[in-house]
Amino acid sequence: MSVTREEAIERLLAHYQEPYRCAERPATASPELAATAFMHLVSDRKILSLAKVGIVESDDFVYIYSVEELTPEVFDRCCTAALTDAFKRVDPNPNHNFSLVSVFFICDKVAPETTAAVKKMKYHKDYENPEHGWVDLRLAAVEVGGGTRCANPMGTVLLNIYQASVN
């Protein structure tokens, strides 16, 4: 069953709707950015599962880009924009555990050189103090016609989310 880019984005947003704050076509964004979904999770920090000793904060910033053809130039521009926006949102305080920047590219066509770039792209940042956490980049690019599906090492979970949500 083949779906359009718009249908795929709607189904992905439906997946993220419950625990995330979702927005379609953010006003200040690039034309390729179709939707965003942000989650901030606060949970208890415990010792031996008994004594509460503080809290732990984690974030997931999801950016869904819709492009006709994913070229290396578009890929670089969108990844830079997503990371820049996510870093404005991260608060690396002593309770911050980790943040994930998850970037979906929903495409009609993925250029072969872009497939290699997606698979090789790695980004990890540790904050100055170990207790202030870290940030990782997860990437996935999918041709909606059933063709290419690729991800970086951290982004394979995004392909599973796409598979469960869209197909």
Task: Describe the function of each predicted region.
Residues 93-117, 143:
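Nucleic-acid nuclease catalytic cores
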Residues 76-81, 115-122:
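"Short basic amphipathic alpha-helical interaction patches in structured regions
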Residues 120-167:
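Charged, structured surface patches that assemble and position nucleic-acid processing machinery
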Residues 52-55, 90-95:
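Short, flexible, solvent-exposed loop/turn segments with mixed acidic/basic and small polar residues
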Residues 59-89:
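A broadly used, surface-exposed interaction patch
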Residues 73, 111-116, 150-151:
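Switch/connector loops and helix/strand junctions flanking conserved nucleotide-binding motifs
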Residues 58-61, 98-101, 137:
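Short, surface-exposed beta-edge/turn micro-motifs
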Residues 1-67:
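N-terminal, charge-rich interaction modules
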